[in-house]
Regions:
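N-terminal amphipathic alpha-helix/helix-capping segment at the start of soluble metabolic enzymes
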Residues: 1-31, 147-153, 289-336, 540
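Active-site beta->alpha loop and helix N-cap motifs at the rims of alpha/beta catalytic domains
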Residues: 2, 55-187, 318, 327-339, ...
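Conserved, mostly hydrophobic/aromatic
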Residues: 29, 90, 159, 202, ...
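Short, acidic/polar
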Residues: 38-49, 93-98, 249-253, 335-341, ...
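A structural motif
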Residues: 52-57, 105, 154, 197, ...
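Glycine-rich phosphate-binding active-site loops on the catalytic face of alpha/beta enzymes
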Residues: 56-59, 105-121, 258-274, 480-493, ...
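Catalytic alpha/beta core domains of metabolic enzymes, predominantly
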Residues: 126-143, 148, 170-320, 396-398, ...
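Extended, intrinsically disordered, low-complexity segments
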Residues: 282-335, 362-389, 395-399, 504-531, ...
Length: 615
């Protein structure tokens, strides 16, 4: 694994209809319908919309035998109209449904957490090694006949592990850990290898981006150790909608794509399925610009653990580094110094002139040659100003520096100036590689100066900035290297959008919270209420509750499991019915949909977590 130079992980090719995946094939884009699978016309129409938007695979839920059998009609309707897109059946709880679906679609997704094991109940189960082996034999006895059906019908499979639906068996032995998620997958993969079944795709997903990235990294390493090269499907489950959904997806998926992991992606947005496709396409196209880049001669620090990174040890300089949360630096060189109270930067880079009226609680950065030592202001130097920096008496100094400027002179200077915060810059096609290389060099030299990452863009659309900046920052955050973020955009976007994006990235990476976090699924044929309007109502009532995590889930597949990561949850329980959760405990069942949002607010209030919105 080269941390500094991009190359795609070598994978085996998997045949999925006329659109193979893995090997030398491009990274495929996909989405999932949210129409009822027994409604042939609606499913075919939505599948066409996904394909017309650029989708290369279409997934449909099949919760029962009738739905699985109707996949034949949906497939036929699409083929009749000239749409040859491979269809994927999404199966939970009932392996018999997978057997049926495998006869009518090009790929079947099964969930190891509920394929043979009973649905998750959060009970701790004790197994002897012999009893555990017997459970694995049960999986083999049920799984092998399914593989034989797939062989007969040239059907591929996806072994799709979800953090929210691990079995009690796995949870009891491994805990709620990346190791448990990986083993849940490997149990099935080893059977595939033993049965010489190779048309297999793997996915391990979570709404928690830290868990998702760490687990996929570990899965790739474990597969490599066991000589497996199956392609990877990437996604952040329950990413949400709007700005949050895009940032969260780009952060998690982008971090893995940037390291060459991933052969197909789905951006799971709580929006129309076809809206996911352009976002996914932009993300893949942006990462693909890393290909064939000039070589970066970085050297990995000896004490860095890619599979289980911890935050880099730094010495705090005022409120930057050490145990402090990552800071946000914003620029205001155009003289427009207004800020959003919810997303007020910690520092504003003003360039060569301070504003006439300063924002309360904000500190300012000025170019060193015009800095005059005013209270609440700090000087910024470039790497060619080392003598000036050395003689400056400020207790906080910013040094803007690209990786290739890290000379012996610079290193020697930094060893005598712990008050310097480094602002890492890069114009390299693979800026992640250079940012990483700079920090790893600091680590090798034993330097503990905090590092803020400067990311430069020229975007006119908020979505483009959100996708690119989140993708660029993802691995840096998950590697534990980030003491701050400085987004500098020279397009037409407002400062408010840029600031909100920076704070959104830190929240999506779970290193700094600035607002309510919503964990919401994209919906599928199992969802029996209007998910998008429900999300809007829940957000309107709770978006001011900074720090709370609220889950809004369409059904019970991942709903209860994902509630373990949420403070409160709203989970579909049947047509027009909702259950409410506090963490993973179901508090009230089968509430009429029209009353559920009000009941959710009552639950939050009853537990002392609600404050009135005074804005």
């Amino acid at each position: 694994m080269d941390l500094f130079n991009y190359s795609r992980r070598e994978t085996s090719e998997v045949n999925i209809g006329a659109s193979p995946m893995g090997g030398s094939n491009p990274i495929r884009i996909q989405s999932m319908t949210n129409t009822a699978t027994q409604d042939t016309e609606a499913c075919a129409a939505q599948a066409k919309q996904i394909v017309d938007a650029g989708g290369e695979y279409v997934r449909l839920t099949a919760q029962g035998i009738k739905e699985a059998e109707n996949l034949m009609n949906i497939n036929a309707a699409l083929r009749q109209d000239g749409y040859m897109v491979p269809l994927v059946a999404d199966i939970h709880f009932n392996p018999k449904v997978a057997d049926v679906a495998a006869q009518y679609v090009e790929k079947v997704r099964i969930n190891p957490g509920n394929y043979v094991d009973a649905a998750r109940t959060f009970k701790h189960l004790e197994y002897t090694d012999e009893e555990y082996a017997q459970e694995l034999q049960k999986i083999r006895d049920r799984f092998v006949p399914f593989l034989n059906i797939c062989k007969e019908n040239y059907t591929a499979i996806r072994i799709g592990v979800n953090h929210g639906s691990l079995s009690d068996r796995i949870m009891s032995r491994y805990g709620d850990t990346p190791e448990g998620m990986v083993e849940s997958c490997m149990e099935f993969l080893r059977i595939c290898v033993e049965e010489n079944f190779t048309d297999v795709v793997i996915s391990i997903k979570a709404s928690n981006t830290v868990v998702m990235v760490k687990t996929v990294r570990l899965l790739a390493a474990v597969m490599e150790k066991e000589g497996m090269h199956f392609p990877l499907h990437l996604g952040v489950t329950e990413a949400g909608d709007g700005e949050d959904g895009r940032i969260k997806s780009a952060l998690g998926i982008g971090a893995l794509l940037s390291d060459g992991l991933g052969d197909t992606i789905r951006v799971s947005l709580s929006e129309a399925p076809e809206a996911e496709i352009p976002v996914a396409r932009k993300l893949v196209d942006y990462i693909m610009q890393h290909q064939n880049h000039p070589y970066i001669p970085g050297v990995e620090a000896e004490d860095f653990n890619y599979l289980s990174p911890s935050r880099r040890e730094t010495a705090a300089v005022r409120n930057i580094g050490g145990e402090h949360l990552p800071v946000v630096i914003a620029e205001r060189m155009d003289g427009k110094f207004e800020t959003n109270p919810q997303f007020t930067p910690d520092y504003i880079y003003a360039g060569r002139a301070l504003p006439e009226v300063r924002e309360q609680g904000v500190e300012y950065i000025l170019d060193a040659d015009v800095w005059q030592g005013e209270v609440g202001t700090y000087p910024a130097f470039n790497y060619e100003q080392l003598p000036l920096m050395g003689s400056c008496q400020a207790d906080l100094k910013f040094l803007f520096m690209p990786y290739m400027a890290q000379t012996e002179e610079v290193i020697a200077c930094l060893k005598h100036h712990p008050e310097v915060v480094i602002v890492s810059q890069s114009n390299h096609p693979n800026r992640l590689g250079e940012h990483r290389a700079l920090v790893h060099q600091l680590m090798k030299e034993g330097l503990k100066n905090p590092v803020v990452f400067f990311q430069h863009y020229m975007e006119n659309e908020a979505e483009d900035l959100q996708i690119k900046s989140a993708a660029d920052m993802g691995a840096l955050i998950f590697d534990g290297l980030c003491d701050g973020i400085f987004l500098f955009n020279q397009g037409s976007l407002s400062h408010a959008v840029v600031d909100a994006t920076a704070f959104g990235i830190l929240q999506a990476g779970r290193v700094r919270t600035s607002k309510t976090e919503f964990i919401s699924c994209p919906g599928c044929g199992r969802t029996l209420f209007d998910l998008q309007s429900t999300i809007a109502r829940v957000k309107a009532a709770t978006s001011h509750l900074k720090g709370l995590k609220i889950g809004i889930m369409g059904c019970i597949v991942n709903g209860p499991g994902e509630m373990a990561d949420a403070d409160y949850g709203y989970v579909g329980a049947g047509r027009g019915k909702v259950s409410l959760y506090k963490k993973k405990e179901c508090i009230e069942k089968n509430i009429p949909e029209e009353e559920a949002v009000e009941k959710l607010i009552e639950l939050i209030k009853a537990n002392g977590d609600y404050t009135e919105n005074n804005l």
